[in-house]
Regions:
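Bacterial N-terminal signal peptides that target proteins for export
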Residues: 1-10
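The canonical Cys-X-X-Cys-His
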Residues: 122-134
Length: 136
């Protein structure tokens, strides 16, 4: 009887961990889609001289990026063979945070070339992380 209970408990824990991993992947996919949307809005804002679109894009990127300030979240979404890159992902999220704050400051000062440079820093941070985590 005890063996059966232990087997059921073990099976339940396995199912729970698989479901949790699947949930983490879904959350990560949604965050990435929303960050992409924010980046696209920033770029469109620069192309069409639309400050409101730039600002809303920056706000969206900042909001979604907050997810990656938590080490446990990062660990849950990194592939098993990339778990050691947790610090890189955390550093990247801080780079994005700094670049978005810098971008807001430059926009407030009407220094659009510098604001666009900050946008490039955001995209470069994303690319650096994706390069290492995805093994590009």
């Amino acid at each position: 009887m005890i063996k059966r209970i232990l087997k059921l408990l073990t099976a339940a824990l396995c199912v729970a961990s698989v479901l949790q991993a699947a949930d983490a992947e879904k959350v990560n996919a949604m965050v990435m889609i929303n960050m992409e949307n924010g980046l696209a809005n920033i770029q469109k804002g620069f192309l069409y001289n639309n400050l409101d679109l730039i600002k809303s894009g920056v706000d969206q990127v900042q909001k979604e990026n907050m997810v990656y300030h938590d080490r446990n979240v990062i660990k849950s979404i990194l592939p098993d063979n990339r778990k050691q890159m947790e610090n890189l992902a955390l550093i990247t999220s801080k780079r994005i945070e700094n670049a978005t704050e810098e971008m807001k400051s430059y926009i407030a000062l009407k220094q659009m070339k510098k604001a666009h440079s900050s946008f490039s820093d955001i995209v470069n941070a994303c690319t650096d992380c994706h390069t290492l985590v995805r093994g590009w």
